[in-house]
Regions:
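Short polybasic amphipathic segments
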Residues: 254-259
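Short pre-catalytic strand/loop immediately N-terminal to key active-site residues, enriched for Gly-Thr
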Residues: 264-269, 317-321
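Phosphate-binding loop of NTP-binding sites
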Residues: 20-24, 45, 58-59, 71-220, ...
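Short, polar loop motifs at secondary-structure junctions
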Residues: 33-36, 54-56, 71-74, 95, ...
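ATP-dependent carboxylate-amine ligase
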Residues: 1-38, 43-51, 63-67, 83-88, ...
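A generic structural signal for residues located within well-ordered alpha-helices
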Residues: 117, 272-275, 325
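Beta-strand->loop->alpha-helix junctions that form or flank phosphate-binding loops
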Residues: 52-55, 91-98, 136-139, 234-252, ...
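The start of beta-strands in P-loop NTPase/AAA+ ATPase cores
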Residues: 3, 133, 154, 180-181, ...
Length: 453
């Protein structure tokens, strides 16, 4: 067993890796300058919560076998400097995941959107089929108590991410996984702070595809023109298999797939999720699960946390929260809800929270992204702008960039709550669907008591 120290142990996925390695019997320690829930509670429950927040170079000595370095840590982090001085092996999160999965069949789900959902669907099917597998996923998935599992299983399912691995290893995380099977779900510019141009962003996927080993399999979204372009450019040396939209119809607002096994009712919303489902099924079939069993399994899939997650279902009101934050995700999520709840009054509320979305240079990418809502709302936090070192945004500029008729913009959470509360409780005709889209929390607003009439 190894002694492993985590620099920035409080990260959402970092602390899950720490817990997974502890379950394997390794001795784990860690530090961070800020640890919030759920990481704080999870670490405390398992005896891994640091006694004090901050960085302590005295924790680093030659008895440590490995350092796992989180993206949150800066280059001048005193613990990192001490580890470098002592020549202790330093791994980014993805490098360590690869280190412990070298002898496994690695499945990597990559792309600009749909990664968490496809990964979750694959996990759900494999569990239903009783296959032994490890995994790493960026959200809580129903039926799984952890986000990271490591064991002696022969397969590992990995949600791939094009964001840099760490402050000292700035290549995208997906570069380190070396998949035997991969999915490319879609391409849409993201992470403007790291990839300032669209070409710079897509170059990362060209590199990823071109460096896949020749005996690997790639399942790609044939409905995405950019995906097709990149596959033709960089994936001619591997087996590339397209997936597309299945045949389906609706029964009582529920999609019903037309399959060889007959009609299959599924519990997901939106064409994008039906596409995601096809990717997951194809991967699982390559892993040895029969097609009929894949469809049996997927019928009971209900989604990952914050992916069109139903949070309110009461008379006259249904509400969903979704992780959507990039323009393509907004469009797909809105379209999904509009299609399933066409007879509802749709109130769509989006929080600008990521570095990209809060950067005025990127806002033009949101042009018409909120079309389809009966009421469209954009919220941003001045505190988030301050933390990210960005200039204040102008409400009129936001309205111009979104180019959506009647768009309301708020930067105060009380004003946002009051507007949504009034709108939800003043509708007298149609039932209401409230769609909350953010990678943040709307400054901690609890939406459950929103309907009072």
């Amino acid at each position: 067993m190894k002694k492993i120290h985590f620099i920035a142990i409080g990260g959402a996925i970092m602390h899950q890796l720490a817990l997974a390695l502890q379950r394997q019997g390794h001795h784990i320690s860690g530090s961070d300058d800020e640890i919030k829930d759920p990481a704080r509670s999870n670490l405390n429950q398992h005896g891994l919560l640091p006694k004090q927040e901050g960085w302590f170079p005295e924790k680093i000595d030659n008895t440590i076998d490995a350092i796992v370095l989180g993206m949150h840590a800066k280059a001048n982090n005193p613990e990192l400097l001490k580890a470098q001085e002592l020549n202790i092996p330093i791994y980014s999160f993805p490098e360590y995941i690869y280190e412990v999965s070298k002898n496994k069949k690695r499945v990597v789900v990559a792309g600009s959107h749909g990664k968490t959902t496809i990964t979750s669907m694959i996990m759900h099917i494999l569990k239903y089929a009783a296959l032994d597998f490890d995994y790493m996923v960026g959200a809580k998935v129903e039926g799984f108590s952890e986000s990271v599992k490591l064991s002696d299983a022969p397969i590992i399912i990995l949600e791939g991410d094009e964001y840099p691995a760490s402050i000292i290893e700035k290549k995208p995380k997906i570069f380190f996984y070396h998949p035997h099977i991969s999915v490319l779900s879609g391409i849409a510019w993201d992470h403007i702070n790291v990839f300032p141009t669209y070409e710079n962003y897509t170059d990362q996927f060209v590199h990823y595809l071109s460096h896949m080993q020749s005996d690997a399999s790639l399942y790609f979204n044939e409905t995405d023109d950019e995906v097709i372009r990149l596959v033709k450019q960089a994936a001619t040396h591997i087996k590339s298999i397209p997936y597309g939209m299945p045949s389906y119809h609706f029964e009582n607002n529920q999609p019903v797939l037309a399959t060889k096994e007959g009609p299959i009712k599924v519990n997901v919303l939106g064409k994008h999720n039906l596409l995601n489902m096809q990717a997951a099924i194809k991967v699982c079939m390559e892993l040895g699960v029969a097609e009929a069993m894949c469809y049996d399994a997927i019928a009971s899939f209900t989604g990952a946390a914050k992916r069109l997650e139903k949070i309110i279902d009461t008379e006259g009101l249904i509400a969903f929260r979704d992780f959507a934050h990039a323009p393509s995700k907004l469009k797909a999520t809105l379209q999904a809800v509009r299609e399933n709840f066409s007879d509802y009054h749709l109130i769509a509320c989006f929080e600008l929270h990521t570095y990209s979305s809060l950067n005025e240079a990127f806002l033009k990418e949101y042009n018409h992204s909120m079309e389809g809502a009966d009421e469209a709302i954009v919220f941003y936090s001045k505190e988030a702008l301050h933390i990210k070192g960005l200039e204040d945004l102008d409400s009129n500029a936001i309205k111009a960039h979104f180019n959506t008729h009647g768009l309301h913009v708020f930067n105060n959470k009380e004003d946002l709550w009051n507007y949504v509360h009034s709108s939800v409780n003043s509708q007298t005709g149609k039932p209401i669907c409230l769609l909350l889209m953010s990678s943040g929390t709307f400054e901690g607003i609890d939406w459950t008591p929103i309907k009072t009439v």
